[in-house]
């Protein structure tokens, strides 16, 4: 495991952490009950089975 040679200051630690950014979720077009909706890919199967309400998307 990597071990730092020197202590990192609080300012530098927070600056490094602040550079992390979340990506937008890729949406996929799916036809459910005759209407086309764009939902995340991981929810497609649940939406087709009726486990997820697609009205909120």
Curated annotation (Swiss-Prot):
The processes (GO biological process) annotated in the record are:
translation
Keyword line:
Ribonucleoprotein, Ribosomal protein
Which InterPro entries does the protein's record reference?
Answer: Ribosomal_bL32, Ribosomal_zn-bd
Keyword Metal-binding among record annotations: no
Q: Which domain of life is it from?
A: Bacteria
Looking up Pfam families in the UniProt record yields:
Ribosomal_L32p
MF annotations from Gene Ontology: structural constituent of ribosome
Cellular compartments per GO CC: large ribosomal subunit
Q: Which family does it belong to?
A: Belongs to the bacterial ribosomal protein bL32 family.
Q: Which NCBIfam families match?
A: rpmF_bact
Q: What is this protein called?
A: Large ribosomal subunit protein bL32
Task: State the organism named in the record.
Answer: Corynebacterium glutamicum (strain ATCC 13032 / DSM 20300 / JCM 1318 / BCRC 11384 / CCUG 27702 / LMG 3730 / NBRC 12168 / NCIMB 10025 / NRRL B-2784 / 534)
